Amino acid sequence: MDPSQHNPPVGHQIVHVRGDSETDLEALFNAVMNPKGAVVPQSVPMRMRKLPDSFFKPPEPKSHSRQASTDAGSGGVLTPHHVRAHSSPASLQLGAVSGGSLSGMASAGASPQHLRQSSYEIPDDVPLPPGWEMAKTSSGQRYFLNHIDQTTTWQDPRKALLQLNQATPPSTVPVQQQNLLSPASGPLPEGWEQAITPEGEIYYINHKNKTTSWLDPRLETRYALNQQRITQSAPVKQGGPLPPNPHGGVMGGNNQMRLQQMEKERIRLKQQELLRQSQRPQIDLQPSTANQDAEHCDELALRNQLPTSMDQDGSSNPVSSPMAQDARTMTANSNDPFLNSVSSGTYHSRDESTDSGLSMSSYSVPRTPDDFLNSVDEMDTGDPLAPSMATQPSRFPDYLDTIPGTDVDLGTLEGESMAVEGEELMPSLQEALSSDILNDMESVLAATKIDKESFLTWL
């Protein structure tokens, strides 16, 4: 036969049609539907084949790793286990269960167990849990009564206990089962005795208190020791209890130092806040009459001392030496309680400053003293003056000349300008300023930037 006939030309395909295709397909169906009737060709027996002798003999266990290896293709060393071998009642280890203890099922062997192992039925001689009773229907089917919950069920409660013991650690088992599965080792404490109920449950008798308990006293002692060890290892700090430190004493010391630093910082901030609050003007603490009397006394003392300081200095500069003397005199004055707190040395002159555009040569923007503003408010509102202040209008121009930054007369504007060299800011205003005066001061300060050639105009 020409081999060129088997190779079709390019682009052509050859289709072969067999005449016996239907019969061959029917034979396949018959072989599947009737396997016994199908003709199976006999194969050569294993003994008749040319196989080595080692194929029929299991390997002997030897110390060499390759000769004793289990991946050589033979499993003679391992006993085969069917995956559903544990589903038959015959393979159930009844010896460990019938003794009253369910702990034997937890160690039923190292062989793998199928998930459907609960398909077997536990024999009737295995005791039920406390409070359960088994009964049978008229057809012979078993059911279980729970006298505790007063319910009935088809499920065997013993199966649930067996699965629970095998699947979960003993810590989640009830207390009675925990005592059975993992009893504490060691002798019982003094005055305790272990006993067993007729059902096989273990309980403990305390002869000192004449009480019984399901709990093992050895477990309670261990729990108390663990709690004491935890409380001793936990660092003691201020501000409440903290969890024990798992990193040791080094981290505990670092945390303690950090907490101490935070506590010191908080105390320092609190002291600064209290000091700042004590430096604010206390307007509502005293009656208005007492404030007026104190202001009048301060004003008289200032008037008596300002001309004397100017004469002693012998200089006509109203900025440097008279104002320094004025500040020292006002600080030494004991009539104002706020000035006494300033003289303690804890007052900072720039705490309440609202501007930052000035040079560092001046502490803050100088302003008109409190006593003058109070007396101007009284004159503007038409309030009568005290009898001791009858000579006040005649002394105002001399008094105002000694104040830096202002050259104000009542109704007159002087032509000469004075240099603004700020000294100590006046501590506080004893009376609240009117909104008009504050608006005028803000407009002048914003427009002139406190230039040396500027002066304030009072309208």
Curated annotation (Swiss-Prot):
Keyword Transport set for record: no
Principal location class: cytoplasm
SMART domains: WW
Disruption phenotype: Embryos are sensitive to deformation by gravity and display a markedly flattened body. Mutants show delayed blastopore closure and progressive body collapse from mid-neurulation, surviving until just before hatching (6 days post-fertilization, dpf). During body collapse, tissues and organs including neural tube and somites become gradually flattened and improperly aligned.
WW domain segment(s): 126-159, 186-219
Record region (Transactivation domain): 247-459
Name the UniProt record assigns to this protein: Transcriptional coactivator YAP1
Source species: Oryzias latipes (Japanese rice fish)
